[in-house]
Every structure is written in structure tokens, then in C-alpha cells.
């Protein structure tokens, strides 16, 4: 068994997550591809594949239990984070991964092909220019500097009725919450437990205020 697989198994054992053999293989396969492409294309500042398991894989998949609905878009996905790990964990849900940089989307297409992911659609576009045929149950991001930027640039993406924004943040984002636009409110803040990750992680769920 590879060092990556051994480490992944150890990390998963520290959570309540139910991860199949196939999913474990796909998660390791994703990290191997990310490590390989990263050397040429600089897709992430994390260089050590073992560190990627903590900072990219576990940090993404712990969000999965909080995804309500079936159709999600990951905006500013970079090399596919958190979208690819979540798509591996939730084959019954559909994930659209959006980024404006061609090299990132090319990488994601390679991942989709190599791992045989049927529920991922890569999209090269600026988020404010992307007009989906159908709106989303959830708009995910861990890339945006501020939640205000996220909700204003992505305001056209969630479903009118029950669509939400899901922002992955570090420390409790109280300062950011005070700056949110009038039409948007925080419905829940969830403290995330990521094994062996230093620092706090929070998932902030935001929605449109009822008219």
C-alpha cells in the first residue's frame, strides 16, 4: 500500500466519514495527478502530496454532510477544490467546477477522464459572465477573499427559493458578516473538524433574505 493511501486511511479513521475502497483509490489518484501537474503548472502552493491529503482532501470532504440538494457549482475552483473531492464522495450529486484559467480547467478535464468521474462538468469562465441553463442548490467556494465578493459576484447562480451560498473559511468570519449586503444573511456557521489541520475551519451558509 502506498504512503499516500496509508496516510489517507489514517486521516479518514479520525472522522465519521464512510469512504468506500473505490473512493479512497480515486482520492489518492487525484492527489497523484495534482502532484504531477503541479510541478509544471503551479496549481497549488502545497508541494507535499501528504500535506495535500490534509489541506485539500480532508478539508474538502468534511463539508459533504452539509450539502443539501443535488446540483452544485464550485466557483474559483482552482485545481478542483473542494469540487473534485466532493464529487468523488457524492456520486449521486452533480458538480460544476468553474475557473477562468485554462490550465486549471485542462487539469480538471484530465482528472475527470483519468478517474472516470461522471458527475463533474468543468467550465472555463469568469463567474460574473457565466449564465447557467439551470440554477444551483448550492454555490461553493473556498477561493474568495470575502463573502461579500462571493455573494455579489455569484448572486445569479443559486436557485431563487432554496439556493444557498457555502463559503469555506478559516477563522470565524464575524468581521466579514458585518459587511454583507442587505439582501443576504448568514443562516448557519458550522465549525469543521479537519484531522491534523492547524487552525480553525468554518463553513458559512448564506442565503437570500425572505422578501
Swiss-Prot record:
Superkingdom, taxonomy of origin: Bacteria
Binding site for S-adenosyl-L-methionine: 76, 81, 127-128, 142
InterPro entries per record: rRNA_ssu_MeTfrase_G, SAM-dependent_MTases_sf
GO molecular-function term, one example from the UniProt record: rRNA (guanine-N7-)-methyltransferase activity
Keyword list, A-Z: Cytoplasm, Methyltransferase, rRNA processing, S-adenosyl-L-methionine, Transferase
One Gene Ontology cellular component annotation held by this UniProt entry: cytosol
Enzyme class label: transferase
Record field: catalytic activity: guanosine(527) in 16S rRNA + S-adenosyl-L-methionine = N(7)-methylguanosine(527) in 16S rRNA + S-adenosyl-L-homocysteine
E.C. designation(s): 2.1.1.170
UniProt cross-references to NCBIfam families, sorted A to Z: rsmG_gidB
Family: Belongs to the methyltransferase superfamily. RNA methyltransferase RsmG family.
Protein's recorded name: Ribosomal RNA small subunit methyltransferase G
Species annotation: Vibrio parahaemolyticus serotype O3:K6 (strain RIMD 2210633)
Gene encoding the protein: rsmG
Amino acid at each position: 500500500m502506498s504512503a499516500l493511501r496509508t496516510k489517507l486511511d489514517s486521516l479518514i479513521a479520525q472522522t465519521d466519514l464512510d469512504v468506500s475502497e473505490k473512493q479512497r483509490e480515486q482520492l489518492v489518484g487525484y492527489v497523484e495527478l495534482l502532484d504531477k501537474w503541479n510541478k509544471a503548472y503551479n496549481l497549488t502552493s502545497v508541494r507535499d502530496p501528504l500535506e495535500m491529503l490534509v489541506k485539500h482532501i480532508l478539508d474538502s470532504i468534511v463539508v459533504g454532510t452539509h450539502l443539501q440538494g443535488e446540483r452544485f457549482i464550485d466557483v474559483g475552483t482552482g485545481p478542483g477544490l473542494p469540487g473534485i473531492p466532493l464529487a468523488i464522495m457524492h456520486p449521486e450529486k452533480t458538480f460544476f467546477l468553474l475557473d477562468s484559467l485554462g490550465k486549471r480547467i485542462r487539469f480538471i478535464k484530465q482528472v475527470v477522464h483519468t478517474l472516470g468521474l461522471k458527475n463533474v462538468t468543468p467550465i472555463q469562465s469568469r463567474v460574473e459572465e457565466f449564465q447557467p441553463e439551470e440554477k444551483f442548490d448550492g454555490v461553493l467556494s473556498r477561493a474568495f477573499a470575502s463573502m461579500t465578493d462571493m455573494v455579489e459576484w455569484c448572486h445569479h447562480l443559486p436557485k431563487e427559493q432554496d439556493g444557498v451560498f457555502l463559503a469555506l473559511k478559516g477563522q470565524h468570519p464575524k468581521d466579514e458578516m458585518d459587511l454583507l449586503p442587505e439582501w443576504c444573511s448568514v443562516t448557519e456557521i458550522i465549525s469543521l473538524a479537519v484531522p491534523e489541520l492547524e487552525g480553525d475551519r468554518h463553513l458559512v451558509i448564506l442565503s437570500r433574505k425572505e422578501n
